[in-house]
């Protein structure tokens, strides 16, 4: 098997540079485009060129490299190797360690027939903004329409695990929406932004309509909000919901369901916060049979050491703690399916 470092991949790079050419003379966008560059476009010579492609964005840095590895591995293990090629767009800060990029590239040898990886150096893209409360990495995908030359893309946080193939999700109808997301019952921004709770989505799992965002030039509004507003409780999530409202669609609940305690927990949280267009039956079915599960409800995060996790889990009551511990071990089992479990166990002090 021969490894290809395809900075000369004409098909993708031609599209990339054509898109870059459109925006390079734009006074607002030019400073951002100057920061972004492709590190490499990689695949093996065994890649099936005629497969359908699913484009996925992942933000990462040195701190979250292992959670990113586990998330990506779960996607690839559950993809349909015979029909689908996963094209991963990995958005990295300028200071990410080369050895961590190489760890991600090792997936090319494990899944040689159905994986491409494109690594982007995002430079110091968001240093210019006044709001430094949140990690810059979280904001990278907000500008993906100006440098990723495809029609649509899935975005996944690193605390998301897959249990099914994502081809059906990827080809969902946008119905003229900018994004499709998982209906978030913890809708922090609804009240003070005047949004409707039945349209407020979590930003950890998204299907993004890059073509429509480019057509309507919504990136200008994104940049304006980043530069002028400081009071977002949920940073990039609030921006996405505010800028794209009301053209926000709801994903089937199986794509992005949270790691709730149980069915009673689901009913309590959703009925308390969302009054319209609520399909509890679908949400409960998704909880029992998820395609993508977002591990949002564990504090500390599910990947921390067994003893720390059990001791410091902030879930209330015996049921809450037991639930969190259950999800902790689900994540560990997924980590064991990677080539880096020894490193992961050492890093997070997992026994």
Which residues make up each language-model segment?
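A glycosyltransferase accessory/donor-loop signature
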Residues: 3-60, 210, 215-351
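Histidine-anchored nucleotide/phosphate-binding helix
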Residues: 65-81
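Short internal beta-strands
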Residues: 86-94, 181-182
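The conserved acidic donor/metal-binding loop of glycosyltransferases
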Residues: 157-161
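Active-site-proximal specificity loops/subdomain of glycosyltransferases
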Residues: 108-146
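Short aromatic/hydrophobic "clamp" motif used to bind/position activated sugar donors
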Residues: 153
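Conserved donor-nucleotide/metal-binding helix-loop-beta segment in metal-dependent transferases, i.e.
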Residues: 162-192
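Hydrophobic targeting segments
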Residues: 53-58, 75, 87-90
